Amino acid sequence: MEDLTKTISNMDMFSLRINRVLDFLKTKSVMLEKLNAIEIFGGTGQNNVAVAISVKTFEIWEIDGKLKPELEKKFPNAKIKICNSIERLKQYQNTSKFDLIMIDNPISVFGAGKNPSEYCEHFDMIKNVGKLIDKEAIVIFLINKKPFFFNKLKKKNELWRKRRQEFYGNINTNDMSIPFLTSFYTELFRNMGLTTIFTNSIPRHNPHLDYFIFMLRKNDVQ
């Protein structure tokens, strides 16, 4: 467990993984320099530098106002909004749309204020991602295929397991396959009126975390 913790804390390794995502998009003839991009869970921005310098515009949403100076320093040309990303997206009626939507979501239950376990992974916001799309967009988010549970977080782990089971259904959510997840999210997006043009998964931390990439098009677009 100590070795795993050390690996998880190595953000340089994670930031390198995003370059593989960008390389994949280039193989699909995606012109990154023409994309308007957004990161919905900004954090310190550690994993987004490569994205920001590759795209046309970059917007960051982050709940922690204390991180704003660091984000402004790392991303001088980005538009930075301090907000609850999930609630903002739920109420989103802005005309601003994006071509590349990054969701570097937490990997367990999380929240703010009186309810630190209010949300889980990307489950509470993925259904609203279409609000950010004009005609089509690339959506990239994290999926925990094989979660690890720290013993000292027993109550939090129980809530996390419950939320995963509710979201994914009657399967073993402790060991999910890429084919299952690809099918699951393709169907989820289809039910939201979004057609999958292409998809791929790229490891961020084996065997647990993967970046899942979906190129989506709204069904009412000809």
Q: How should each PLM-predicted stretch be described?
A:
Residues M1-V30:
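Class I SAM-dependent methyltransferase Rossmann-like catalytic core
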Residues T44-V55:
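Conserved SAM-binding loop of SAM-dependent methyltransferases across substrates and taxa
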Residues K90-I101:
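A short acidic, Gly/Pro-enriched loop at the edge of an enzyme's catalytic core
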Residues L100-C120:
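A short SAM/SAH-binding and catalytic strip from SAM-dependent methyltransferases
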Residues Y119-K135:
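A short glycine-rich, Lys/Arg-flanked "PGG" loop and its adjoining helix->strand segment in the class I
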Residues D175-M192:
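Short alpha-helix
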